[in-house]
Amino acid sequence: MSNQLSPKPPVNPIVMGKIGSAYGIRGWLRVFSSTEDADSIFDYQPWFIQSKSGWQLVEIEGWKYHNQDLIIKVKGADDRDAANLLTNCEIVVDSSQLPDLGVGDYYWKDLIGCQVVTVTGYELGKIIDMMETGSNDVMVIKANLKDAFGVKERLVPFLTEQVVKRVDLSAQTIEVDWDPGF
């Protein structure tokens, strides 16, 4: 019997990846990581998944690369049927584990929900998602209901200095130099 305290469920949950399909017959599973370097997902422990009864701790026995896939062995999932029960579950950790960022760097989770306003004061809408492209991140902005340009959604590059002029996370606003008609 262990004297270790059981890890506490996340207070500020953040999704770090997703458990994919079973791999083989011994309970291994594919993992899809949302971290910049795929295997960095293992730096954030403990993992939790959301189940009908609440947060469930996921203990990793091991992990490895197989071809281009990351695969994991979860404690208690010793066959394909047990592994299949975890398929499509989101991997969640407490956001307090994320490292502090430097000035001018932001986590996407902090940008989502911010109101985006042009330098002329036109409200473009709220960020509902972020996308990664080959060259830069892009804000997915849901336009206001009565948008003068009839736009429902805008894609605006998150380029500091060129497009993004000011980010105020405490006020949940981002000022951009962007043509609302574009």
From Swiss-Prot:
A cellular-component GO term for this protein: ribosome
PRC barrel domain sequence ranges: 103-182
Pfam families cross-referenced by the UniProt entry: PRC_RimM, RimM
Keyword Amino-acid biosynthesis: no
Sequence intervals crossing the membrane: none
Domain of life of the organism encoding this protein: Bacteria
Subcellular location(s) per record: Cytoplasm
GO MF annotation list: ribosome binding
Subunit structure and binding partners: Binds ribosomal protein uS19.
Sequence similarity: Belongs to the RimM family.
Comment field on protein domains: The PRC barrel domain binds ribosomal protein uS19.
Protein known as: Ribosome maturation factor RimM
Lineage summary: Bacteria, Pseudomonadati, Pseudomonadota, Gammaproteobacteria, Enterobacterales
